[in-house]
From Swiss-Prot:
HAMAP family: ZapA_type2 (MF_02013). It comes from Bacillus cytotoxicus (strain DSM 22905 / CIP 110041 / 391-98 / NVH 391-98). The keyword Glycosyltransferase does not apply. This is Cell division protein ZapA. Homodimer. Interacts with FtsZ.
Length: 89
């Protein structure tokens, strides 16, 4: 859920052992959740690819997250189309 228009949240988060100051339109709890998911994904991928440096690990994480996003978006579109065909929308 977005905060009031124009109101930004600023929060410090830790991702893969590094501190980042993040500013966003969402609540601080949402920003913390996003940071935790990124951290978890990086650690998961590092466990499978321990020889990757942090930069390559970050790129691999981004590729994996975008892959998941695209698959979910495609699934969402299929469900919307199915609902449209059934007259449920």
């Amino acid at each position: 859920m977005s905060q009031q228009k124009g109101k930004k949240s600023r929060i410090n988060v830790e991702i893969y052992g590094q501190q980042y100051s993040v500013v966003g339109d969402e609540s601080t709890s949402h920003i913390r959740m996003v940071a935790a998911i990124v951290d978890d994904k990086m650690r998961e991928l590092n466990a499978k690819n321990p020889s990757l440096d942090t930069s390559r690990l970050a790129v691999l994480t981004a590729v994996n997250v975008i892959h998941d996003y695209i698959k979910l978006k495609e699934e969402h579109e299929k469900l919307k189309e199915s609902m449209r065909q059934k007259g449920m929308e």
